[in-house]
Amino acid sequence: MRREYVKKLEITSLGVPIHKPCICHCLRYSFGICNLQHPEICDNCEELFNFFDLIKNNVNRELHESLDDYLKRLISWMGHHTRKLYLNTHVQVNLDELDEDGAVIIVDYKMRILPCSARETKSQFFGKRGWSLHSSLVYTKDANNNKLNVQVFDHWSDDTGQDAWFTASSLHTVFKNLDPKPKWVTIMSDNGPHYHCTKLMLIIGHWKDWYDVIPRKWIFLEAGEAKTLIDSHHAQVISHYVQVIILFT
């Protein structure tokens, strides 16, 4: 079902959503930028909604509320895949713009990570502060073979602080260790306050003087979207961390 639904969503290679007459497949409508009519509903979508109506007509009324809740969840699930397609396309658009002088950096925080033990009590668990992990995936293009290279930089703090200073410190280390160093960068992140804030924007204004790197643009995406690769990296890091903890417990 997911594959068939996503196939009917259309977006240009430049990341521009395309109008569709079926409102369920119109990306422009999904993001509130469509002023055209949606005169029809496709057969698959109509069958889906008719299916829920059919069930409601053949079950007790006390189950109707649960069915409505399931339908809302299904619509939310469809919305998630709509956003994912749209935002992942924008990631690809920026990667396609790369040349040998630039870099695309995708950054993200892992939510608070709690130290774990195989034999800890509940009071021990809730008393912990945990630590924060910040990852930067740096994409550059090899001028010799025109292929993308990826470097990963992980930084963690022994508290749960996720703010502009931790972000700036992490990126400082990235620029100091990148080899070769790019002439310009595009940053992609969620729109959390640790990125989307005045303090960090003021710091970015000094990047040219400090690192000889031009910040071409900073793209803010929805939290949790379009970061599949960095999410996979976080999963591997946490899995390795948990295995080490268990081994030494």
List each language-model region with its residue ranges.
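Extended mixed-charge, aromatic/glycine-enriched low-complexity segments
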Residues: 1-249
